[in-house]
A protein has these predicted regions:
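Short acidic, low-complexity intrinsically disordered linear motifs used
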Residues: 1-8
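Short low-polarity hydrophobic stretches
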Residues: 3, 87-88, 182
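Active-site and NAD+-binding cores of ADP-ribose-processing enzymes
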Residues: 12-68, 94, 104-209
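Extended catalytic/binding region for NAD+/ADP-ribose chemistry, centered on the ART fold
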Residues: 74-100
């Protein structure tokens, strides 16, 4: 089986380990050969080849960020209460990375950041509930509001921060990290997806040395 055929056969849904899963991509920090989340529970190692249930991080109880989740990654701060494993349907995250100049926009993929191929449980599709939460009084779905404030146990839903976002976030209740991708594999996957969808998917490059 060539690389392109492998992608076609594994890019949507498949049965794995007795579960219905969706294949997705997740960015991690790699420190001393071990994987760690970028933001929430960033000090907790994530093993390869093992199912891990999502957990809700520490919720901020007061102040201007009350109700958000406290992060302990490189940047600190907080994120919205949107529990679950966050992955994407393409290995692209141009909003995360190292700026070329102080306080600039992300321009480079950090040396410690690696893409992985992950499986997200897909036994239950929570999309209808997420869309219901994001529907306004006029019946229009506001995508940035179409989420859940609880972990989608045994399932997943798709989420967009805005309509211009490339691809979707896939938010799931359980995750299995299947393998770490090389930069060449990331480039090949995005190139093939670009040809298939007619959209240019391109992740940030590494900083030139």
């Amino acid at each position: 089986m060539n690389f392109k055929q492998f992608l076609i056969e594994s890019s949507i849904f498949k049965n794995f380990d007795g579960k219905k899963v969706i294949v997705a991509y997740k960015l991690f920090n790699m420190i001393d050969g071990k994987l760690y989340p970028l933001y929430v529970n960033a000090k907790k190692e994530i093993p390869l080849h093992k199912w891990i249930d999502a957990e809700i991080g520490p919720v901020i109880s007061d102040g201007k960020n009350k109700g958000k989740i406290k992060t302990n990654g490189k940047l600190g701060g907080s994120v919205a209460l949107r529990p679950g494993w966050h992955a994407g349907d393409h290995p692209v995250a141009t909003h995360i990375g190292e700026p070329a100049v102080p306080k600039g926009k992300p321009a480079y993929r950090r040396d410690s950041e690696v893409w992985t191929e992950v499986y997200i449980t897909a036994e239950i599709d929570y999309q209808d509930q997420a869309n219901k939460n994001g529907t306004n009084k006029q019946g229009k779905i506001i995508k940035k509001n179409a989420d859940l404030d609880y972990i989608p146990k045994n399932g997943y839903y798709r989420y967009k921060t805005n309509s211009n976002m490339l691809g979707d976030w896939i938010i799931g209740g359980s995750m299995y990290v299947n393998r770490i991708l090389t930069d060449d594999e990331v480039e090949k996957i995005n190139k093939l997806d670009s040809e298939k969808d007619g959209i240019v998917y391109k992740d940030l490059p590494r900083r030139p040395r």
